[in-house]
UniProtKB/Swiss-Prot annotation:
It catalyses: L-threonylcarbamoyladenylate + adenosine(37) in tRNA = N(6)-L-threonylcarbamoyladenosine(37) in tRNA + AMP + H(+). Binds 1 Fe(2+) ion per subunit. This is tRNA N6-adenosine threonylcarbamoyltransferase. Keywords: Acyltransferase, Cytoplasm, Iron, Metal-binding, Transferase, tRNA processing. Fe cation binds at residues 111, 115, 311. NCBIfam families: gcp_kae1 (TIGR00329), T6A_TsaD_YgjD (TIGR03723). GO terms for biological process: tRNA threonylcarbamoyladenosine modification. Gene3D superfamilies: 3.30.420.40.
C-alpha cells in the first residue's frame, strides 16, 4: 500500500510517499527560509501563499523520486491541524482534491500525532510509550496507549521550547530558525557561565513554563554592553543547558505519572520506551541527555532520525497508514488551527 503524505502546517511545504512496509519511497521538503528570514520568524500569510505555490512542484518532484504514477497511490493523507490555518487549509484541500480526482480515500491527520507516531516508522516499538514532544509551537508529555489513544500528562502553560530558542536567537541577532544556530554556538560556550531560572522545576506534575526563561535571557542580553563572539557562545550554552535541565527535571515527574497512568489503564511493557520527537528533538545535546535519563529509570530512549523530527510529510503518510490499519479515519473533516491529540 502506497500513501501520499502532505504537510503544510507551518513554513515547510512537504510531500512524501510511504508504503505499509515502513519504506519511505520519496520525501520532498521545500523550505520557505528565504521568504521568512527578513522577518526573523514565520509570517502566516506569506507561508500560506508559498504553500500554494510550492505544492504542485513538490508533488511532481515526489512522484519523480518515487518513479511511480498516481495510479500506484492507494490513499492520500494530509495535515489538517493544528497549525497556521492558512497553510493547513491549502494542504488539506490540495490533498482532498487529489483524493477526489483519483477516487481514493482521504485521511485527515493531526500534525502532533504525526510526530508521536513518527518513531514507529523506523523503530517497531510497541504501545504504550511515553513521548516528550518538543517543537516550535508545542511542548507536551504524552502517554501513548495506541493509535488515537493519547493522554496529555503535562504541557507548557505559556510558550513552547522551540519558540524560546527562536526568541533568544532574535535577541542575539543570529538569524532564523534559532534552534540549530544556538545548538552550534552552544558547543563553543560555557553552559555554567550565566545562571538562568529553572522554571517550575520545584512544582508537582510535569507542566512546563518558558516565558520566565525568555524574560531572563532578554534581561541578560540587554545588561551586557559588548556582545562578543565568546559572550554570545556562553549565552547560547547557558540558555540551552537551562532548557535541557528544565526538561530533564519535568521528565522525571512525567515518567512517574506515565507509570501510574498505565498501571490503571494498560498492561505496561517489560521494555519501556521514552520517545522524544518534534523539531527541537533534532538537538543532539537534548536528545542524548534524555536518553541518559531514560536509561537511569529503566527506559529505552528513542527518537526518530533528525530529518523525521523536523516537519516532514513522511510522518504524515505513516500516521495515515497507522490510522487506516486501525480503521480510524473519516473523509468528513474541517481543517482547524487548534486540535488536541486527546480529541482523536
Amino acid at each position: 500500500m502506497n500513501v501520499i503524505g502532505i504537510e503544510s502546517s507551518c513554513d515547510d511545504t512537504a510531500i512524501a510517499i510511504v508504503n505499509s512496509n515502513r519504506e519511505i519511497i520519496a520525501n520532498v521538503v521545500i523550505s520557505q527560509y528565504t521568504e521568512h528570514l527578513p522577518y526573523s520568524g514565520v509570517v502566516p500569510e506569506i507561508a500560506a501563499r508559498a504553500h500554494l505555490k510550492n505544492l504542485q512542484y513538490a508533488m511532481k518532484e515526489t512522484l519523480n523520486q518515487a518513479k511511480i504514477n498516481f495510479t500506484d497511490i492507494d490513499v492520500i493523507a494530509a495535515t489538517s491541524g493544528p497549525g497556521l490555518i492558512g497553510g493547513v487549509i491549502v494542504g488539506s484541500v490540495f490533498g482532498q482534491a487529489i483524493a477526489c480526482a483519483l477516487g481514493k480515500d482521504f485521511i485527515a491527520v493531526n500534525h502532533l500525532e504525526g510526530h508521536i507516531l513518527a518513531v514507529r516508522l523506523n523503530e517497531n516499538i510497541s504501545f504504550p510509550y511515553l513521548v516528550l514532544l518538543v517543537s516550535g509551537g508545542h511542548c507536551q508529555f504524552i502517554a501513548v496507549l495506541g493509535v488515537g489513544k493519547y493522554k496529555i500528562l503535562g504541557q507548557t502553560i505559556d510558550d513552547a521550547v522551540g519558540e524560546a530558542f527562536d526568541k533568544t536567537a532574535r535577541l542575539l541577532k543570529l538569524g532564523y530558525p534559532g534552534g540549530p544556530i544556538i545548538e552550534k554556538l552552544a558547543s563553543k560556550g560555557d553552559p555554567h557561565k550565566y545562571s538562568l531560572p529553572l522554571s517550575m522545576t520545584k512544582k508537582s506534575g510535569c507542566d512546563l513554563s518558558f516565558s520566565g526563561l525568555k524574560t531572563a535571557v532578554k534581561q541578560l542580553i540587554f545588561s551586557i554592553e559588548s556582545l562578543s563572539e565568546k559572550v554570545i557562545c556562553d549565552i547560547c550554552a547557558s540558555f540551552q543547558y537551562t532548557v535541557v535541565q528544565i526538561l530533564l527535571c519535568r521528565s522525571i515527574n512525567a515518567i512517574k505519572l506515565f507509570e501510574s497512568y498505565c498501571s490503571n489503564n494498560f498492561k505496561i511493557n517489560r521494555k519501556n520506551y521514552f520517545v522524544i520527537s518534534g523539531g527541537v528533538a533534532a538537538n543532539q545535546y537534548l536528545r542524548q541527555e534524555i536518553f541518559n535519563l531514560a536509561s537511569t529509570y529503566g527506559y529505552c530512549g528513542v527518537a526518530p532520525p533528525s530529518n523525521l523530527c523536523t516537519d516532514n510529510a513522511a510522518m504524515i503518510a505513516w500516521a495515515g497508514i497507522e490510522r487506516l490499519n486501525a480503521n480510524l479515519f473519516s473523509s468528513n473533516f474541517v481543517p482547524r488551527a487548534k486540535w488536541s491529540v486527546e480529541e482523536l
